[in-house]
Swiss-Prot record:
Chloride binds at S327, G328. FAD binds at A16, E35, R41, H43, V44, S47, R123, I147, D316, V329. InterPro entries: FAD-bd (IPR002938), FAD/NAD-bd_sf (IPR036188), Flavin-dep_Halogenase_NPB (IPR050816). Belongs to the flavin-dependent halogenase family. It catalyses: (1H-pyrrole-2-carbonyl)-[peptidyl-carrier protein] + 2 FADH2 + 2 chloride + 2 O2 = (4,5-dichloro-1H-pyrrole-2-carbonyl)-[peptidyl-carrier protein] + 2 FAD + 4 H2O; (1H-pyrrole-2-carbonyl)-[peptidyl-carrier protein] + FADH2 + chloride + O2 = (5-chloro-1H-pyrrole-2-carbonyl)-[peptidyl-carrier protein] + FAD + 2 H2O; (5-chloro-1H-pyrrole-2-carbonyl)-[peptidyl-carrier protein] + FADH2 + chloride + O2 = (4,5-dichloro-1H-pyrrole-2-carbonyl)-[peptidyl-carrier protein] + FAD + 2 H2O. It comes from Pseudomonas fluorescens (strain ATCC BAA-477 / NRRL B-23932 / Pf-5). Its EC number is 1.14.19.56. This is 1H-pyrrole-2-carbonyl-[peptidyl-carrier protein] chlorinase. One of its GO terms (molecular function) is FAD binding. The gene is pltA.
Amino acid sequence: MSDHDYDVVIIGGGPAGSTMASYLAKAGVKCAVFEKELFEREHVGESLVPATTPVLLEIGVMEKIEKANFPKKFGAAWTSADSGPEDKMGFQGLDHDFRSAEILFNERKQEGVDRDFTFHVDRGKFDRILLEHAGSLGAKVFQGVEIADVEFLSPGNVIVNAKLGKRSVEIKAKMVVDASGRNVLLGRRLGLREKDPVFNQFAIHSWFDNFDRKSATQSPDKVDYIFIHFLPMTNTWVWQIPITETITSVGVVTQKQNYTNSDLTYEEFFWEAVKTRENLHDALKASEQVRPFKKEADYSYGMKEVCGDSFVLIGDAARFVDPIFSSGVSVALNSARIASGDIIEAVKNNDFSKSSFTHYEGMIRNGIKNWYEFITLYYRLNILFTAFVQDPRYRLDILQLLQGDVYSGKRLEVLDKMREIIAAVESDPEHLWHKYLGDMQVPTAKPAF
């Protein structure tokens, strides 16, 4: 008989951890999830992309998600603070104001996706459903239990120190999965965390009841899209996400220095930012704020390693950049999906050395690299993003990214084309789009981590 309590201990019961537990439990792997909070709890990151659909179907939770009656998300839209004509620079299919854009997810077929929509979710309810589902499949789930430390003895032998109030318990496992989100428990413990060299984002957000979503669009069929409103403030935008029929999540995302240099409280900063979009500001003021403002900092970081002897990092515990394209839950679910395959094989082979997880390492680094480069190119020249969305030559390639379909292991050529155009704009101060360049520098094609 094994002297291990579990094959795998999973730190964190958010979407990454619960999805990992579901895959492992379905495969007969003895696993336990330790979540320091008691669900339900509030959490940001409320809009999904279609790349989450195959995962939700595979682990068998989709029916429960559907019964929760979360708003359906058929598409996404981006609105501009600018007005007036602009040179189209040879792009095709652009309308009179191509600084705005919109997409329907069903314009492009995606493997494993069986519907035209995904969901906007109340993360408190969504995360609880996923965690309870993992338990129903046979994973052990412990809430209100914090992991204080992890001791790596040898590949296949790990001691996890768990705390419940003043009581400490040692748990023996063959390996650990860090799904602790932005707490990045193992990343800090092992000295793996690195601050992102480009991003230093900051968000302020709340929920509003009876917000008039028609203020963002004249099309009734689009009121339940996610809306991203560009603001005239550098590197600043607003999300607008339906949560229920009447409640809308609204948040301002900016570079942290924009906030710290303002001498405003974060609530004052929120209102000053949205004031630059009159329709949005007026609609928010006419609604009822039903949650206190919350701020999210420490947004952007990476890890020097995402796996090693007896450990794997997934979801936000592995990487987080920026929420502009709703990538967070998709990265959580897909990193769990990819890593679970390696872990199941490691358990079968009783081999928990780093080499057992190299498939996951390559796949997730490539997928997140695609997200990262897409996001940085957007911030460098967002008028180029909206031009590519509208141009039929590039629309489906951009839609692939917006669907979250980035885990094929292949290089996405559309990113090279965007980079090429940005380089031309950067090198020519007389270029008609030069004035739209953001102040974030596009990194090399191969990130440092």
